[in-house]
């Protein structure tokens, strides 16, 4: 459980995990933008699966960081 309260923006309530998801998505975009020019995707068998695993790992790290 998170200690952060539910955040209300313009009458819409958002759970704390929503902001963790958005933060991990922003970091995922940055990491992906850095990995594409390096050519690492040439060695990846399934890029969509790699992207999903990368996002899941980033989300796990962020959620462990803000517990």
UniProtKB/Swiss-Prot annotation:
A single GO cellular-component term on record: plasma membrane
Pfam families, sorted: DUF1656 (PF07869)
Keywords of the record: Cell membrane, Membrane, Transmembrane, Transmembrane helix
Sequence similarity: Belongs to the AaeX family.
Subcellular localization(s) per the UniProt record: Cell membrane
Main localisation: membrane
Taxonomic source organism: Salmonella gallinarum (strain 287/91 / NCTC 13346)
Protein name: Protein AaeX
Segments traversing the membrane: 3-23, 43-63
Keyword field contains Cell membrane: yes
HAMAP family: AaeX
Entry-linked NCBIfam families: PRK11594.1
Annotated membrane topology: Multi-pass membrane protein
